[in-house]
Amino acid sequence: MVLIITAGSISGCLSQSEEKISDEEEDLTPLRINHIQVKGTHNSYHLAPIGPTIRAYDYSHDPLDIQAEEQGVRQFEIDVWWDARGQLYVYHNQYDLRSNCITLEECLTTLLDWSNQNQEHVPFMIWIEPKEWIEQSTDNTVVIDLQNMLENIEQEIIQYWPRNKTITPDDVRDGSETLSKAITENGWPLLDDSRGKAMFILLSSGDLRQSYHEKYPGLNGSRMFTMSEPGSSEAAIFSDTDPIGNGDEIEALVRDGFIVRSRADNAEDGEADNNDTTRLEAAISVGAHSISTDYPEEVDGIEYWVEIPEGNPVACNPISAPIDCTPERVESLSE
């Protein structure tokens, strides 16, 4: 009888405790995609050339899944070159060819495999930068058909990244007149509804971006967001790599609800060689949502590398996150 009573008492205590926890959770402010701050990598695929090279090329990244698993990277940047055989290859340029994933398919598949095994991760931000081959002859200069290249990229995203694991402009717009109005009036999707997914962003401006907008007016039906211009109907995600000089502008965008990518360093600019964290600290303080680096982990001979303060590995955004945000609420894959 004692055992039965004790068991009943314990059960009652657990029930009351669970009720209390549930009530506390209900009182918490719901977290959204723009309430986070993550580490990103610049040219995430990059491997330094073998042999002597210039400083700008002299850095290497681990495979994308290792970056996600061991270094806490949640934002990636992939340069894509179109090949006449129809393949989309990934490398920096013809003088800097080495890559830890050779094709866009391989890069996406590597990240997707990790994502499927860690489905509570915050959304990946995957920036795709199309590169333009210019073929020269004595008579003319021919630029590869950009529209076809963009469509090839779009189709590979469709083929190699499932729709139910993709956050698209249509998902964010959700009936609003424009994408920009959806963000400023309704906000980004809830973080808990967005875990295990990815957002793709076209890292380009000018004619290339215009061509994409012509194909997908207002980004209706598109898989990718575009690098925005302030005030445009497509405005959602911005890239500003100068958090020192443009800190006020970045912070204003963050406060308005937009997502901003920035940079902590650039190999040839000397931050890593001089262990200079000024740019990193500026990017953190103005609320950049992703902070891209060439050095996401310690490297022999260099004292500099990037960590997001209080990140688990992802942190609460210091500008946009609600006061009751904690790193554990943002992401805790180890639990």
Stretches found by the model and what they are:
Residues 1-22:
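Secretory targeting signatures
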